[in-house]
């Protein structure tokens, strides 16, 4: 869901309103509390595992040695922050999160850190830059959040004064709309539920954020790769992680080995395998298992060779010439079922509308009042593939009457209720 909210922000940035807020950059936020997190050896170790590996904190909040395999943090600079990019009136800075009082997080309370990590609110009340993964970290359990804060307090303090992040005024206004306060308890996956664990890990690590082509002319599909990601002047296209021959079609053990070693295909150092290499076999296996539930996408993506046009994502990237849009074989659907599917469906959280109609015997969908027709191809009488959609759509049919909702079969199912 974090990535869907990011997509909504990107769409808003494409249609920017005139800035008129009295205090741009200040979002809605819950008040700070005086809570503190108890320090225990178990929490410190759990926090280290999360911050160094799953959450990849030091991939952004450190200067990195791009001449070393995997581009690890520069020795002695872990967590000291860095200027990630600077161009014109836009500067993106990952701040110093070491306990240095003068230039880092040493003067921040536990709740300031917790609110920043999970809710995207800086210690001064401003919204953090939307590229910080707090929308993914929002799904961190309360205990894991406490562990991360406790661990960050153990880092050696590093004196490193950095300039602030700067955003153009219009983007600053839009950026402040994204944070959402968290008041209710957040729990983690139940012990022993490996599928729930895999979803938790994928969500918190925001794997779909990089491995889905959110901004491409055509979305190849969830985890279908082709997203251009970068750090400074370095650019790479993310890999297809679905269980297709063009993606992660190899065995579980091979996936785990690749993630530990960084050796597989054309793995690029922008992909933070240096962090993921420290994940346990159990966690990597849980991730692999859940990726097997994602609809397979035919999309070859590489980072070696000349960029070529790709029909699947509409971009140019290495191996792009090997890609053609592949449509599934439609199954027969009874007429009385088809007649119950047309209607208007809406998900308020994402301001997402799907209009479904019948036309010349076909089921056609349009999103958000647009003019692009998407033919829905039946995978079953109630489950449909749409070219360019993030995931298949499942219609909910009662015993009689029209369908009541559509469920987009993403990692976290997104429900669109019938409104007409």
Question: PLM features: residue spans?
Answer:
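Bacterial N-terminal signal peptides
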Residues: 4-17
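Electron-transfer interface patches adjacent to heme c in soluble/periplasmic c-type cytochromes
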Residues: 77-112, 135-145, 222-258, 273-285
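Peripheral terminal and inter-domain segments
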Residues: 324-420
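C-terminal capping alpha-helices of c-type cytochrome domains
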Residues: 109-123, 136-162, 252-265, 275-302
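The canonical Cys-X-X-Cys-His
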Residues: 47, 54-64, 113, 148, ...
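Surface-exposed interaction/gating patches
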Residues: 48, 134-136, 173-249, 253
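Boundary at the C-terminal end of the N-terminal hydrophobic targeting segment
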Residues: 19-22
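Electrostatic cytochrome c docking/interface patches
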Residues: 26-52, 175-203, 329-339
């Amino acid at each position: 869901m974090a990535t869907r909210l990011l997509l909504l922000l990107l769409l808003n940035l494409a249609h920017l309103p005139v800035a008129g807020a009295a205090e741009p950059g200040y979002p809605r936020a819950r008040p700070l509390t005086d809570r503190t997190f108890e320090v225990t050896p178990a929490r410190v170790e759990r926090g280290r595992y999360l911050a160094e590996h799953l959450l990849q904190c030091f991939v952004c909040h450190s200067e990195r040695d791009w001449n070393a395999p995997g581009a690890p943090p520069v020795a002695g600079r872990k967590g000291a922050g860095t200027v990630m990019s600077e161009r014109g009136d836009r500067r993106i800075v990952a701040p110093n999160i070491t306990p240095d009082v003068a230039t880092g997080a040493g003067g921040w309370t536990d709740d300031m850190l917790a609110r920043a990590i999970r809710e995207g609110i800086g210690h001064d009340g401003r919204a953090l830059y939307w590229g910080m993964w707090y929308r993914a970290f929002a799904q961190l359990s309360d205990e894991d959040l406490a562990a991360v804060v406790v661990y960050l307090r153990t880092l050696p303090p590093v004196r490193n004064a950095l300039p602030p992040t700067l955003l153009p005024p219009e983007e600053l206004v839009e950026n402040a709309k994204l944070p959402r306060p968290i008041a209710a308890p957040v729990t983690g996956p139940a012990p022993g539920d490996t599928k729930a664990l895999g979803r938790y890990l994928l969500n918190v690590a925001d794997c779909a954020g990089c491995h889905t082509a959110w901004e491409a002319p055509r979305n190849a599909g969830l985890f279908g790769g082709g997203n251009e990601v970068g750090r400074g002047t370095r650019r790479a296209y993310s890999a297809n992680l679905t269980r297709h021959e063009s993606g992660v079609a190899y065995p579980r053990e091979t996936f785990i080995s690749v993630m530990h070693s960084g050796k597989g295909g054309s793995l690029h150092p922008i992909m933070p395998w240096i962090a993921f290499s420290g994940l346990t076999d159990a966690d990597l296996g849980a991730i692999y298992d859940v990726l097997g539930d994602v609809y397979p996408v035919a999309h070859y993506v590489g980072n070696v060779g000349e960029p070529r046009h790709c029909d699947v994502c509409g971009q140019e990237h290495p191996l792009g010439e090997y890609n053609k849009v592949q449509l599934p074989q439609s199954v027969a659907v009874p007429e009385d079922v088809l007649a119950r599917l047309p209607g208007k469906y809406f998900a308020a959280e994402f301001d997402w509308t799907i209009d479904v109609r019948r036309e010349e015997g076909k089921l056609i969908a349009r999103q958000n009042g647009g003019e692009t027709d998407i033919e829905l191809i039946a995978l079953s009488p109630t489950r449909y593939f749409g070219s360019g959609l993030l995931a298949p759509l499942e219609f909910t049919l009662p015993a009689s009457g029209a369908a009541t909702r559509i469920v987009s079969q993403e990692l976290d199912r997104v429900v669109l209720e019938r409104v007409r």
